[in-house]
């Protein structure tokens, strides 16, 4: 299998408890010398209305959110099927929340969020 690309949404086997669900790839493609891993953000239809959830509308996803607080890294073998890709604008929206969650952006500067 070729390496997944940043911005692609894949159906991923997250195990018995977390189920098979769509996930957004946020890592860059792995090279042959790299471990075959992808960093992803799971999509959920059960929103908690957290400021770290990103609501993205696409034709290939049910209504729901990407839960940035659940960023994980998985082996490529868990990637089942490519569902589609987010637009540049949608990725920018996810990246903004991801930078806030990871502490690369000051939360006090984000007063309008929530």
Predicted ranges, named:
Residues 1-114:
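Conserved functional hotspots at enzyme active or ligand-binding sites that engage polyanionic ligands
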